[in-house]
Amino acid sequence: MLSVSCPRVYMSRKALDFGQLASCRCRWAGRSGMRVAPRRRMPCVCFVASPSQPGLAAVDVPAEAISSARTTTMIPERISVSSLLEVVSDDLLKLNNNLKSLVGAENPVLVSAAEQIFGAGGKRLRPALVFLVSRATAELAGLLELTTEHQRLAEIIEMIHTASLIHDDVIDDSGMRRGKETIHQLYGTRVAVLAGDFMFAQSSWFLANLENIEVIKLISQVIKDFASGEIKQASTLFDCDVTLDDYLLKSYYKTASLLASSTRSAAIFSGVSTTICEQMYEYGRNLGLSFQVVDDILDFTQSAEQLGKPAGSDLAKGNLTAPVIFALQDEPKLREIIDSEFSESDSLATAIDLVHRSGGIRRAQELAKEKGDLALQNLQCLPKSQFRSTLENVVKYNLQRID
């Protein structure tokens, strides 16, 4: 079973090899001055980490553990984002009210940009995951409510994500996002780049004020990973020798790193054991990889109206994603077309057809489900609650997009 890892063991810059499955019991820790929730000792499972090759990880899980966690193939009903995140709706409402004020009012252009960015809405999935993990782990530590650190962490994560979108729109020369004109379309490239830089800097300032060195290192690494992912993508355009490992590592940098670091940080602020924190990191990593693979599948299976951009646009730019990488293994003609950088008028349409006919879409779907199943396994060490159930449903929501 193939799985990419963070290129470090949190702070040590080494890879993770999640191998032998072990069992553990959840630790309970009371907080002074606070009533500790009733003690329940619940068996749970966790992974034991050991050094491995940089950037890669292998997972060896007993069959019975997989069968108990593998529920992604049966989704009884469609899940909507609004209903999915209802359990943390109050937390998200508070976050929305705070976001614009966090940007500050020093510069009218930045204020206007903040209105444009945060006013566009969005699912707020990343801060929602912070709240869900925070509340799912809080019971283990006897916390009755989330801390101010949990709340500020969610705000920081959304600011970092938004800053990355501003820069992505500049790099991709995108004119619209969420139905609104992008910052660089309204104010020009220079202002957009500076606005993104400002939001990265502002989020870093709030991050430093959390005064937790482990969380500071985790989230700071995310910003570095964003740049690494963009550079890796730019250096492999139209490269038919790009491997699945290369793709997964790039996807970790661009998507999964933020999710993994934010879910682990949420658990850290709950004060739970290192084992639980590691599992929350792996949940975010596997979920992030699954999300990226699904997005890359939709680039071939949805219409331009659904995508908000032409179908196959990543392929047209030379960005070879999972469906293409799988298709290249069986379709030599596809390599010829990509090597020519679609010089013929109908070559892109032919390439898209080859990706479909080769089974590349099907194999990418299997990869997305594999990562989703791993994410579900990572949640097994949490006590059952509506928050754990919602974290499971986030995995299912993602996979139902390719049903």
UniProtKB/Swiss-Prot annotation:
Tissue-specific expression: Expressed in leaves, stems and roots. Highest expression in leaves and roots.
Binding-site list for an all-trans-polyprenyl diphosphate: R177, K254, T255, Q292, K309
Top-level enzyme category: transferase
Annotated residues for binding of isopentenyl diphosphate: K123, R126, H161, R178
Pfam family membership, one: polyprenyl_synt
Assembly with partners or alone: Homodimer. Interacts with FBN5.
The protein, known as: Solanesyl-diphosphate synthase 2, chloroplastic
UniProt lineage: Eukaryota, Viridiplantae, Streptophyta, Embryophyta, Tracheophyta
